[in-house]
Amino acid sequence: MSACVAIIAALPREVKALVKGWESSSPARNVRVWTKGNAVVACAGMGADRVRLAVQAAMAAKPVTTLISAGVAGACDPRLRVGDVVHVGTVVDARTGERFEDPEYTQVLVTGAEVAGVAEKRRLFAAYGASAVDMEAAAVARLARAHGLSFAAVKAISDGAEFEMKELGRFATVDGQFREMAFAGYVAVRPWMWGRLMALAKNSDAAIAALTKELEAQLDWYRQRG
């Protein structure tokens, strides 16, 4: 069977540039799928529960052989900077302690249940030597194992280890979406947050640009494998 890679991300904005010009569909509410050749990208929202829907949609669209968990992530290692790409060697599920290993790489990604603030990033760095933290990779890895598929994870840093992000969690919906208008309204009446919001937007753009470049390179590699 030819290699067919499925990239699983949380939100469409993380892959918008990557999938420009691809065929797109929405098989269910807040589930988006894009296909091109032997590649598929799927998003269904933030968190482990939404990962299952994204993976199901990807596998329904193509005969998937590899799952890649991709997206932006928060740095736990203070040496990492915005736009740095993390090639994950170990995914740790913070809730269960499960580990998913890729011997090709060494960096550690911890998957948590909510957006991590500075204190949690510090704790994860101390406890696991974590490079970064996300909310989806462990669920993608678990589903890859269950279906006998290859797995990889690649993340781009959108917020440094000392950049506070915890309040973003209150704007996540039950189906893993981000309430952008509600967040904008929250910040609008808190002028002391405006500078941090502008930095967050700039940092997110830089992270997504780096992620897009990395994923394009990985897709080229899979295409060459045939």
Residue ranges and their predicted role:
Residues 1-6:
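Extreme N-terminal starter segment of soluble prokaryotic enzymes
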Residues 28-226:
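Glycine-rich phosphate- or other oxyanion-binding loops that anchor nucleotides, phosphorylated ligands
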Residues 17-25:
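Short, aromatic/basic amphipathic alpha-helical patches
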Residues 11-12, 137:
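Helix N-cap/beta->alpha junction signal
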Residues 14-18, 50:
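Short N-terminal binding/cap micro-motifs at the start of the first secondary-structure element
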Residues 8-10, 42:
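Short hydrophobic segments within beta-strands
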